[in-house]
From Swiss-Prot:
GO terms for cellular component: small ribosomal subunit. Part of the 30S ribosomal subunit. Contacts protein S5. The interaction surface between S4 and S5 is involved in control of translational fidelity. GO terms for molecular function: rRNA binding; structural constituent of ribosome. GO terms for biological process: ribosomal small subunit biogenesis; translation. This is Small ribosomal subunit protein uS4.
């Protein structure tokens, strides 16, 4: 599947917020002018219409999770079919992606690196190798690093970085074993308040 391979900081500047596409726990606004649009001089951002605001929010979330447009739309359709709040269902589906769970557990420094670990068959779910980044992890699934991948320096570095991040309450991780359990789907209160999923629902409801 095609992936965006351009500058990561450019995407964060376009959305006006840190999308956490680079490794590390320090906010990137100390390294680049995040409030400015991409480009050498950072052209002034125009005032957005309601549609523009909704579109930017969708792009921000889509890029945060590293999902392409068609797949993101399919996630929305699935979220709308499920019972409950469509916006919260959408976030739950994105959080349940295997590459995201690997990132949340601290096995990858970024979601992109976590996706690579999955595609390179370095990840096991319930004792079986899974190399599909979009695989939906379910409650009580056990995710771990394959034995032969445990010596990779990038995995060890990612775990060290994860120690500096807030630990998700819906996961249980044993860093020494490089293993974690997906205890439950995260609740809306567990996730970033910077995401306004209602804008995405409004966008796709038109």
């Amino acid at each position: 599947m095609a992936r965006y391979l351009g500058p990561k900081l450019k995407l964060s500047r376009r959305e006006g917020t840190d999308l956490f596409l680079k490794s590390g726990v320090r906010a990137i606004d100390t390294k680049c002018k995040i409030e400015q649009a991409p480009g050498q001089h950072g052209a002034r951002k125009p005032r957005l219409s309601d549609y523009g605001v909704q579109l930017r929010e969708k792009q921000k979330v889509r890029r945060t999770y590293g999902v392409l447009e068609r797949q993101f739309r399919n996630y929305y359709k699935e979220a709308a079919r499920l019972k409950g709040n469509t916006g919260e269902n959408l976030l739950a589906l994105l959080e349940g992606r295997l590459d995201n769970v690997v990132y949340r557990m601290g096995f990858g420094a970024t979601r992109a690196e976590s996706r690579q670990l999955v595609s390179h068959k370095a990840i096991m779910v319930n004792g079986r190798v899974v190399n599909i980044a979009s695989y939906q992890v379910k409650a009580n699934d056990v995710v771990c690093i394959r034995e032969k991948a445990k010596k990779q320096s990038r995995v060890k570095a990612a775990l060290e970085l994860a120690e500096q991040r807030e630990k998700p309450t819906w996961l249980e991780v044993d860093a020494s074993k490089m293993e974690g359990t997906f205890k439950r789907q995260p609740e809306r209160s567990d996730l970033s308040a910077d995401i306004n999923e209602h804008l995405i629902v409004e966008l796709y409801s038109k």
